[in-house]
Amino acid sequence: MKYRILMATLLAVCLGIFSLSAPAFAAKQTLTYDDIVGTGLANKCPTLDDTARGAYPIDSSQTYRIARLCLQPTTFLVKEEPKNKRQEAEFVPTKLVTRETTSLDQIQGELKVNSDGSLTFVEEDGIDFQPVTVQMAGGERIPLLFTVKNLVASTQPNVTSITTSTDFKGEFNVPSYRTANFLDPKGRGLASGYDSAIALPQAKEEELARANVKRFSLTKGQISLNVAKVDGRTGEIAGTFESEQLSDDDMGAHEPHEVKIQGVFYASIEPA
C-alpha cells in the first residue's frame, strides 16, 4: 500500500513539472472542437506567465525563425476629423461589430541576424489578414482589412539576446478590402460588371468617376511589437503591439480612414 502511495505521489509531481515546462501553445492543443466552439477561445493568443522575464540568446553564426506568431487586437481606434476647425484630428475608440474572428495566427518567417547586430523578421506565411468592421460613436461603420502581409520588422542594433527591452518595428502591405470580382450594389466592378451605372455623367465629375472606375489599391502600414515576456528555455515571447493602417476605400470610391490597432501578441523563436 505504501509503495502505491509513493508511486502515485511521484507520478503527480512529474505531471506537475511537465505541465509547468510545457510551451504555452500546448495548452490550446489539448482542447477539442466542442471545448472551443462558441466560446471565443479560438480568437485568443497563447499567453506566458508574468514570471517569464528571461532572455533568449542569439548566436550570429546561426539562423533562426519566428513561428506561431499570433496577434490579438483588443482596441481599434479611428482618426476622426474634429467639428471645430481649430482642433486637430485625433484617434477615437470604436466598437467592434465583427464576430470573434479578428486575430492573426500561425504567422511564420525568417529571423535574420544583420551585420550591425540587429534582427529582422520577414513574414512568409500564415493567417495574416482578417476582414474587420468597427462602428464609430455616431453610427458610421468602418470596414478594414487587419493584416501584416509581407511584414519586415527590425530591432535596434547590437542585440545579443531577446529580452523584455527588445522591440520590433517595421512596415507591411495592406491589400484592398475587396477583390477584383466584387460587384457593388449597382453592379460595378473591377474585372466584371458595368463600367458605369449613370447614363451620361457630367464631364470632370470626379466623385462619379471614383465610384465608376474601381481600383485595387495597395497601401502601407506600420507596426511595433514590444516584447514584455520571454521564456529563455522554450524560446517563447509575448508582449503588446500597435499598428497603423488605412481602412477600406470601397475600391477608390471614397477616402479611407486612418486606423490604429492595439493588442497583444505571442510568438516562438526556433533555430532554422
Swiss-Prot record:
The keyword Thylakoid applies. It is a peripheral membrane protein. Residues 1-26 form the signal peptide. SUPFAM superfamilies: OMPA-like (SSF56925). Keywords: Membrane, Photosynthesis, Photosystem II, Signal, Thylakoid. Its main location: membrane. It is found in: Cellular thylakoid membrane. It comes from the Bacteria. Belongs to the PsbO family. This is Photosystem II extrinsic protein O. It comes from Thermosynechococcus vestitus (strain NIES-2133 / IAM M-273 / BP-1).
